């Protein structure tokens, strides 16, 4: 099997981004542009991955991380793509091939690169090319009209009128034989208007030496689109999101509008899932069968089981939701929360680091934190757990079949025993007995002949 090395060129500053952040660290679908390229490279199971970095290099390494499968190669001066690959040459194998990728071309697909590599041998060169309706500004692929073999790549400024009509362009992504790569790089020249060493000049060397040049093409043009400014970044963001939506719809997901939907991680859906507009899914999210996510919800690292419904404007993060639950609208489920089956969490309710057992309801205007709640519990409007004493968090235990009246404060640590009822407006500071009514209120008083204070209009 052919050994494959990968070199990712990520040294550019990205002046047109108008940002102090290196271009390859700008986020696309919730993670740095360069991370997308690395993820795709890893699907190829390469022998090694070399990342050529330059501008903002230490920050790039810090954000991406020094993973064991990465070799970081510094390009102190940005002297062109050929010069960049030459910096990685000492780390590459003597045999096999090298795939050259770009750190600012984040959406090329694994299947596209695998098809490219399948055409590679140790005695040829393979280019990823694409046909564009408007190829203006790109280097044209010039082929022999009889054999269809590549003769040259002609840059726009050097192209004749007939060559400018050619729609096939060079993407820059290529597979090079390691056995010839060193000699080719040594013979590159910077005698051009930019004073740089261009990797594409290798193609002319290969043609002159009679070395076969093969080509392959992606399924979609946007796969090979690069990011040079924030307009292009926004275009690729939408292309990526639309591609993700298309894949999910092919699996049966129903979108109210696939153009108003974002995945910033990984979303896995069961059958008959419905997703309304302006929903965002971050990290790892799994939706079971017949789940409905209404408009303007954010789910981050969440499992939502079969038949559950999340109503509009709800935020759920690092939590598990059981079957047939109802959440929201305007609910916030914070990290460490587990909702068992058939739990109802209503409007303006916040739950943090709590376990809510099946068939319990927290329907209105409540805060539940650091709580173990049993089955069939009803929490009245405005009830809260007071879990923080200013220094430490404490847990509240609410056992099965408890009814908590509205505007109740449960001051942790405290246990409300099975079957208890807590009267509205109570502040509970001690454990309650099982099956009894517990309340703490001042006696209601009415004062006769009392007059409300009034402002002196004079």
From Swiss-Prot:
Binding residues for acetyl-CoA, per the UniProt record?
Answer: 381, 387-388, 406, 424, 441
Q: What class of enzyme is it?
A: transferase
Localization, UniProt: Cytoplasm
Say if the entry is tagged with keyword Nucleotidyltransferase.
Answer: yes
- List the residue ranges of the region (Pyrophosphorylase): 1-230
Main role? Catalyzes the last two sequential reactions in the de novo biosynthetic pathway for UDP-N-acetylglucosamine (UDP-GlcNAc). The C-terminal domain catalyzes the transfer of acetyl group from acetyl coenzyme A to glucosamine-1-phosphate (GlcN-1-P) to produce N-acetylglucosamine-1-phosphate (GlcNAc-1-P), which is converted into UDP-GlcNAc by the transfer of uridine 5-monophosphate (from uridine 5-triphosphate), a reaction catalyzed by the N-terminal domain.
Protein name in the entry: Bifunctional protein GlmU
Question: Which species is this UniProt entry from?
Answer: Nitrosomonas europaea (strain ATCC 19718 / CIP 103999 / KCTC 2705 / NBRC 14298)
